[in-house]
Amino acid sequence: LPVGLPPAHFGAQAKKFTDYFKRDGIVEFVYRDKPYAIRITDVVCYPQAYAAAATMLHTLMDDPKAVVLDIGGFTADYLLLKNGKADLTSCDSLENGVILLYNKIRSRGNSELDLLLDESDVDAILAGRKTSYPAEAVRLVERLAQEFVNDLFSTLRERMLDLRYSKVVFVGGGAILLRRQIEASGKVGTPLFVTNINANAAGFEYLYRLEAAGR
């Protein structure tokens, strides 16, 4: 069973997390009205952002530094890579998830334009899809999204991560949503995007198969 934890929690919690799944006995559960009884014989834990970028790691082996940035709903997790290997001394979970952006847009849209914009409205505008909202609403959403991205990159710079001179692997639904703003920021040297929304889960399986093949 391959599982994962946010990079910032990996070092302290990985053993406890794997031990939880390795507990003795049969695990019984029902999935889609079908009962299952399984025994878990092997568990391996991986850092989440690293796993999501796993299929790109071979392209980063010659880079002294690269960064994986996983932008989710509640947090943005970053992890420094050195020659394609995770540096768990330089990682953290920042409270910069896109929920903050949604809330800010909702508040500003209501106060400045008397509009009630929900998440699906924001997603449609940021994706460039046609909506019935006026041009000033579109401009507000895009401006706040750009500010959100710029603020995130400034926070990373304060943590001694200058993205202008490195490859950055962007993963997570937030990164996919904000791709245009990321590319327009001018603050990322070489942005690379993992567009699979289930990239972490796929990465867990990929890394586990590599590890199992080498045993």
Question: Over which residues does each language-model region extend?
Answer:
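Phosphate-handling catalytic cores of nucleic-acid transaction enzymes
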Residues: 69
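Short beta-strand scaffold segments in enzyme catalytic cores
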Residues: 76-80
